[in-house]
Design a protein with these regions (language model features):
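Conserved beta-strand in the GNAT
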Residues: 38-40, 46-56
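Short amphipathic alpha-helix that is part of the acyltransferase structural core
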Residues: 1-26, 66-69, 150, 167, ...
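Short beta-strand element of the conserved SAM-dependent methyltransferase core
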Residues: 4, 39-41, 153
Length: 172
């Protein structure tokens, strides 16, 4: 995804080693309860998209569901590329007996989740997903629906304790 966001002042890349460990069957303990498949989309020699299909078996048992997840998704603004990536994961999920696809999600709730739908002009963080504004448009076009809202806030720490708080501290 680094090339996809090259020159974007709001994108904060994740740590490559951390992502490689997360995606590694040998290093990520989530694979004790999960299985995954990874797809890359190419145009010529150039990678133009990626997606992971994940089945979190433990979560499916707890919630009595047959859901696959999609995550680690990035793509250029091209309908053919997006459709091919999602068709591959949808087909894989159906072959595995899943009846729904949910995401973007990772292996566990400790992984990055969600898709940015506004605030594209705000700097991202390493703890959140950043994506281009065209991502939600492609999701809607393919018939995917938003499940819930996630909100991110900035908290500014003042250089000094505000006078009002000092007075409250004295009273207490």
């Amino acid at each position: 995804p680094i090339d996809l966001y090259k020159g974007n002042p709001y994108y904060v890349p994740g740590l490559i080693d951390e992502e490689m460990i997360t995606l590694s069957r040998d290093k990520n303990p989530a694979f004790e309860n999960c299985e995954a498949i990874y797809y890359l989309a190419y145009r010529g020699e150039r990678i133009v998209g990626r997606i992971a299909g994940i089945i979190a078996h433990a979560a499916n048992r707890v919630w009595n569901q047959h859901r696959a997840r999609f995550g680690f998704v990035d793509f250029i603004d091209d309908q053919e590329v997006v459709d091919a990536l999602f068709a591959a994961v949808e087909k894989w999920a159906r072959k595995k007996g899943m009846d729904a696809l949910h995401g973007p999600m990772g292996f566990t709730d400790l992984d990055h989740e969600g898709m940015l739908i506004m605030g594209f002009d705000q700097i991202g963080t390493m703890a959140t997903i950043y994506n281009h504004p065209y991502y939600p448009q492609h999701m809607e076009r393919m018939g995917y629906n938003k499940d819930q809202d996630w909100h991110e806030f900035k908290i500014y720490i003042p250089d000094a304790i505000p006078e009002k708080h000092l007075r409250i501290a004295e009273i207490v």
